[in-house]
Amino acid sequence: KDVETTLNNVVGVDFNNKIKVTPNIEVTFLENGHLIGAAMILIEINYPGEEPINVLFTGDYNNKNEFLNLHELPMRVRNKRMSVVIESTYGDTSVEEINHGFFSEKVLEAIEERKTIILPVFSLGRSQEILLRLKELQDTNKLDVNIPIYFDGKLAQAYTALYCNSKILIDESKKDFFPRNLVAVNCEIREKLLQTDDCKIIVTTSGMGTYGPAQVYIPYFISKENALILFTGYTAEGSFGANLRNAEEGEIVKVGGLICKKFADVSYCNEFSAHAKSEELIELLKKFNNLRGILINHGQTKTKDAFAEKILREIDINEVGILNRE
């Protein structure tokens, strides 16, 4: 009931349009590549006789998105006396640390060895990006179109349907992102997939392996040598994906309610990310011509500290605040 009440009060707005919240407060949503529909939020507070207050909240931020053509920040925003609250998820990670090409290399290697490939994905953003990458591998004749690709996860399937809906304005050149030989999985098909060891690709939620159909596939394939489980995104400490990271071959692991021996190849790629890296975050801050203050949030303590030090080295500002620092 609360959700329905909330949704009935939601009003869609365009990017870069000022919204008057009160006579003295205006809000503007600014483009953000984190996910489809993501936005940075600029709050402008103006009272007669007082210095204007402008605060930009980046939220989860990325400077790019496979499915969007992002525009530059408007100059009217860049020239304001601005305080920025910025995320720091990858504030200590350099662009140079990203292993580009690892995903394709691992997938094609596993196909050559006729393995079953499990690709845990997040429902929104990562699912569609992985489907696009698999299509690109097919289009360049690197991935055999006869290899079946199964797509599991109700929420991921629902989000993917939205990408195909003209109401979501994604890049026209990316609208045809389905790989050939793609099958949407239901419960019946899922059971059949567990009964065969033939070469196939299974794209499944959840991204960290903790929820969704991944909790069905991983326990089954973790003990098989002819399987690759390739995590395509961030695995938070304590998540199932993170717990598998340090398990050696043949080591006993707990998977849901099962205790299994790990013989599958479990790998992790970092080339897909919905968060900007440290240099890209700095690049965003450098766009502002009159920075008043910077506050860092959303990151591990050591990451926030490292990013704060980088800001002080590279941005003309004397101090940086860290929110929720332990």
Model-derived features: where do they sit?
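Short, solvent-exposed amphipathic alpha-helical segments in soluble enzyme
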Residues: I43-N46, E72-R76, G101-F102, R133-D139, ...
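Short acidic-hydrophobic, aromatic-tinged amphipathic segments that line or gate anion-handling sites
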Residues: N8-N16, R180-E188, G321-I322
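Active-site neighborhood of phospho(di)ester-bond hydrolases with catalytic His/Asp-centered motifs
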Residues: F29-G33, L56-Y61, V85-T89, L119-F122, ...
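A short, acidic, amphipathic alpha-helical segment used as a generic capping/interface helix at domain edges
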Residues: G212-F221, S273-N289
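Generic long, charged, amphipathic alpha-helical segments
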Residues: V253-L284
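Hard-cation-handling environments
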Residues: E105-F240, N297
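Short, conserved loop/helix-junction motifs that constitute active-site signature segments
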Residues: L73-K80, L143-D144, Y220-E225, K286-N290
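His/Asp/Glu-rich metal-coordinating catalytic cores
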Residues: K1-E129, R133-D144, P148
